[in-house]
């Protein structure tokens, strides 16, 4: 990086008039209230989701381990974002009339940036682990059932490699220079930021295709079993596979939709930044925290989908046992119907 570029970012110590107006505006304060509310709700539902996975788990052990790790990651991410927002609100109130003390220097945000982006990328690539966990369970069910923890640990390891690789390409070695209004904003000298967001979007798109395909295969397999098997146990297992695949599919689609807000949304904001005033841009940007929204959806879906599945499971078991009984009873009913 040439010296001129470093001098330029270092010289922008004081907030412009537009940035000052934005940071002290009701709009940005409302965005912080929204984000803090989302974070507090995510804490509540994360507690419920962890308890649900521990006591009333409807997923395989492999999927459960992945979800538990993702929930712990989400708590760390939300806590980091909460600290970032509280610092910004405090500074916007205390230094409202001092534009040169409103922005944060990169060195004031190094810890937050490190934790924030590592947990952000780990959340993004959780869709990879969940999608391929379902794919492996679909194509190699016997191996999957006997090696569930190995499968989940292997997928989580790949997820971690993706996370560290993305952080290395995007932020590792970036000079600690420049000023930002929020500590979660990417440094101005991070030149690969847009490419990273595009790569994250591509990975999530591929994972959605894989998950929808696995869900289709699960539904197709269940229909075949319903037509050819009279064993309540086999029919029940097929139903459970569909329920698990459906839950993971919902999780991934919601994660994708939320994370798309921060990846594509931020990219488009940067592209059209020249058409927006400094004040307009900085009023909109604080709302684009997709991973924070996704970290609320994750425990919410786990908890609500588990309750719904347990209720449907009881109904399904009742229907299967009352309708079919054992195979002998079913054959006797068929004989009577053929007489």
Curated annotation (Swiss-Prot):
User: What is a single molecular function from GO for this protein?
Assistant: G protein-coupled receptor activity
GO cellular component terms attached to this protein's record: membrane
Q: Which InterPro entries match?
A: 7TM_GPCR_serpentine_rcpt_Sra
Record bears the keyword Plastid: no
Q: What species is this protein from? A: Caenorhabditis elegans
Tell me any Pfam family this protein matches. 7TM_GPCR_Sra
* Phylogenetic placement of the source organism: Eukaryota, Metazoa, Ecdysozoa, Nematoda, Chromadorea
Q: Which PANTHER family match?
A: G-PROTEIN COUPLED RECEPTORS FAMILY 1 PROFILE DOMAIN-CONTAINING PROTEIN-RELATED, SERPENTINE RECEPTOR, CLASS A (ALPHA)-RELATED-RELATED
What name has this protein been given in UniProt? Serpentine receptor class alpha-24
Subcellular locations according to the entry? Membrane
**Does the record's keyword annotation contain Metal-binding?**
no
Coarse class of the primary localization is membrane
Membrane spanning segments where? 26-46, 65-82, 112-132, 151-171, 199-219, 248-268, 284-304
What family does the database annotate? Answer: Belongs to the nematode receptor-like protein sra family.
**Keywords attached to this entry:** Membrane, Transmembrane, Transmembrane helix
Q: Which GO terms describe its biological process?
A: sensory perception of chemical stimulus
Topology relative to the lipid bilayer, per the entry, is:
Multi-pass membrane protein
């Amino acid at each position: 990086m040439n010296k001129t570029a470093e001098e330029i970012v270092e010289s922008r110590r004081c907030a412009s008039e537009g940035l000052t107006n934005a940071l002290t505006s009701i709009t940005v304060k409302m965005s912080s209230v929204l984000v803090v509310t989302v974070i507090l709700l995510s804490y509540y539902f994360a507690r419920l989701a962890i308890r649900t996975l521990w006591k009333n788990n409807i997923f395989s052990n492999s999927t459960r381990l992945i979800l538990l790790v993702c929930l712990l990651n989400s708590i760390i991410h939300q806590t980091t974002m909460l600290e970032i927002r509280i610092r910004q609100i405090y500074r916007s109130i205390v230094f409202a009339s001092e534009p040169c003390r409103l922005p944060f220097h990169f060195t004031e945000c190094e810890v937050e940036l490190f934790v924030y982006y590592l947990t952000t990328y780990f959340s993004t690539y959780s869709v990879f682990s969940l999608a391929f966990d379902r794919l492996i369970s679909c194509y190699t069910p016997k191996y999957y059932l006997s090696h569930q923890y190995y499968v989940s640990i292997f997928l989580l390891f790949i997820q971690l490699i993706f996370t560290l690789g993305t952080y290395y390409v995007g932020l590792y070695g970036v000079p600690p220079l420049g000023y930002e209004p929020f500590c979660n904003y990417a440094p101005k000298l991070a030149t690969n930021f847009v490419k990273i967001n595009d790569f994250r979007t591509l990975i999530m798109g591929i994972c959605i295709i894989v998950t929808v395909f696995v869900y289709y295969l699960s539904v197709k397999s269940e229909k075949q079993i319903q037509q050819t098997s009279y064993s309540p146990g086999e029919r029940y297992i097929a139903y459970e596979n569909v329920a698990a695949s459906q839950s993971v599919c919902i999780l991934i689609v919601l994660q994708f939709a939320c994370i798309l807000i921060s990846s594509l949304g931020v990219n488009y904001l940067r592209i059209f930044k020249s058409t927006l005033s400094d004040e307009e841009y900085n009023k909109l940007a604080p709302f684009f925290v997709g991973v924070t929204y996704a970290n609320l959806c994750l425990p919410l879906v786990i908890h609500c989908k588990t309750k719904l599945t347990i209720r449907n499971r009881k109904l399904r078991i009742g229907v299967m046992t009352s309708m079919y009984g054992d195979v002998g009873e079913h054959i006797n009913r068929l004989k009577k119907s053929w007489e």
